Amino acid sequence: MRKLVVGSRRSKLALTQSRQFIERLKKVEPDLDIEIKEIVTKGDRIVDKQLSKVGGKGLFVKEIQQELFDHEIDMAIHSLKDVPSELPDGLTLGCIPDREIPLDAFISKNHVQLADLPDGSIVGTSSLRRGAQILAKYPNLEIKWIRGNIDTRLSKLETEDYDAIILAAAGLRRMGWSDDIVTEYLDPELLVPAIGQGALGIECRSDDTELLDLLSKVHNQEVAECVTAERTFLKEMNGSCQVPIGGYATIDDNGRLTFTGLIMSPDGKQRFEQTATGNDPVELGKEVSDILKEQGAKEIIDALNEES
């Protein structure tokens, strides 16, 4: 196997995820020679704006994909929730490895549970999806935008006027944070996760058969089927970071999938949600999207995409 160059965002979490995946690869191919190339994306450079107000898709992947096309890197290790549902021609997801916990983590001052927060409490999140779902259930709370890496957000919780923050549990786990800092993990029935949350997507060139053969050895087919249902729903709904959209699939021992798709208005006042089961992940994602479109969810998405 030739020497491989892995493209990664420069954030601590992205680099940690990349190193952990390389370790996983080396368990099946111990003699691999791999280096990481750090790449700064548009999403990384935007630190003073809410990403939902920037517009566009692929804010954290486009520059990395260009490096693949230019043969500067051989593969890219993405948080799958950052990857648009349609990839450019010539690129493919070479594998979907094991998935970390897909839930959202609620972290509050003095470990006060979400249900016990006083009216007017300020909850920090960078996600329209989280904000809309919290407001729907707890309209007397205030949602306040927060950006930065995990360390920065935890610091802001301590030093600024936030009473709580919500983060992806997967990032906390991968960065080695103890469960002790988490007040509670939020059940998907309360907070439907983001599409692909907790999963990684390993992107490479479609014609790189040598690398694709290697990646197949660390591919998790069950996770791939779950995220395929989720990403099909995202594609069919034309979702983006301007839209409060969620989707979460599970698979049972018989290979049967259960998928919940969610579309909301940013203020939490309109909610479209549907759960369905099936054996074909693509058909399942389409089925749920068709139902939500019939209910009127498409109007929310079209309006939000026009605003961006």
Curated annotation (Swiss-Prot):
Pathway(s) where this gene product acts: Porphyrin-containing compound metabolism; protoporphyrin-IX biosynthesis; coproporphyrinogen-III from 5-aminolevulinate: step 2/4
CDD domains with a match to the protein in the record: PBP2_EcHMBS_like
Positions of modified residues (S-(dipyrrolylmethanemethyl)cysteine): C241
Keyword field contains NADP: no
GO MF term list: hydroxymethylbilane synthase activity
Recorded GO CC terms: cytoplasm
Residue ranges of coiled coil: none
Keywords, comma-separated and alphabetical: Porphyrin biosynthesis, Transferase
Co-factor note (free text): Binds 1 dipyrromethane group covalently.
Reactions it catalyzes: 4 porphobilinogen + H2O = hydroxymethylbilane + 4 NH4(+)
EC annotation from Swiss-Prot or TrEMBL: 2.5.1.61
Assembly mode: Monomer.
Physiological role: Tetrapolymerization of the monopyrrole PBG into the hydroxymethylbilane pre-uroporphyrinogen in several discrete steps.
Miscellaneous note of the record: The porphobilinogen subunits are added to the dipyrromethane group.
The family this protein is said to belong to: Belongs to the HMBS family.
Name used for this protein in its record: Porphobilinogen deaminase
Organism: Staphylococcus carnosus (strain TM300)
